[in-house]
Design a protein with these regions (language model features):
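Short N-terminal micro-motifs specific to bacterial/archaeal maturation
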Residues: 21, 28, 48, 149-152, ...
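Flexible, acidic/Gly-rich N-terminal and inter-domain linker regions that tether
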Residues: 1-28, 32-36, 40-41, 197-203, ...
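Short aromatic/hydrophobic contact patches that present stacked aromatics
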Residues: 24, 70, 147-149
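Short hydrophobic/aromatic-rich motifs at helix boundaries and adjacent loops
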Residues: 28-31, 57-58, 133-134, 163
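Conserved AdoMet/S-adenosylmethionine-binding subsite of the radical SAM
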Residues: 77-220
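A generic, residue-level signal for flexible/boundary positions that often mark functional hotspots
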Residues: 5, 11, 46, 133-136
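Conserved Radical SAM active-site core
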Residues: 2, 9, 21-22, 33-117
């Protein structure tokens, strides 16, 4: 069984499909506690949830008629029945499935799924307070279907992101995004850093949904 905090249709606010419609399935609970977390409400023990089977979630997704599906959280890979749901979704050729994961869960077991979802993996930078939890071996397993996202709140974070990008040769491996911690660093500061360091192949990403709606809004 899986605890679903919310399920809704909106636009993808970030990533390679930014601006496209997607079904979002947000699971409750996370094994990390990042300083800038914008979905802390979904990680509380008393968060109202729907407890659903993998098949129930799949059927509800199908009824919505939207091709893109994003599994998010919380931390979706830290759920007992998530493998079953991933297999159900992967068998449906009508769907394009993306999983947002926090970088602390080993990805290898999930990468064996035939027609597996794409992985958007956070690498938690120093200002998150969670860099010590990163499972760095994941960075060697990603391919062109996948993305690594660095959410940066300071120049120090950007320096660390550059180190990781270079150490693991991420530009040659997968998509790479730099994103500002909302309200902590100006996007223009990130652009200047990218220019000064000739960060070819890196994409600046802004959270589109926070521009369109209230940054604290749920279900958007």
């Amino acid at each position: 069984m899986l605890d679903v905090a919310e399920m809704f249709v909106s636009i993808n606010g970030e990533g390679t499909l930014a601006g496209q419609l997607a079904v979002f399935v947000r699971f409750s609970g996370c094994n990390l506690c990042c300083s800038y977390c914008d979905t802390m409400w979904a990680n509380q023990s008393d968060t109202p949830c729907r407890t659903m089977t993998a098949e129930e979630i799949y059927n509800e997704i199908c009824k919505m008629g939207i091709r893109n599906v994003t599994l998010t959280g919380g931390e979706p890979l830290n759920r007992n029945d998530i493998f079953e749901l991933m297999e159900l979704l992967a068998k449906d050729s009508r769907l394009y499935v993306e999983i947002e994961t926090n970088g602390s869960i080993p990805l290898k077991p999930f990468l064996s799924i035939k027609n597996r979802p794409s992985m958007t993996m956070d690498y938690k930078l120093p200002s998150s307070g969670m860099e010590h939890s990163m499972y760095t071996e994941n960075l060697n397993l990603l391919d062109s279907r996948d993305t690594v996202k660095f959410v940066s709140g300071s120049i120090g974070d950007l320096e660390r992101a550059k180190e990781i990008i270079n150490e693991y040769k991420l530009i040659d491996r997968c998509e790479v995004y730099l994103s500002p911690v909302f309200g902590k660093i100006e996007p223009s500061t990130i652009v200047e850093y990218m220019k000064q360091n000739q960060m070819n192949g890196v994409t600046l990403q802004l959270q589109m949904h926070k521009i369109i709606w209230n940054p604290n809004a749920k279900g958007v």
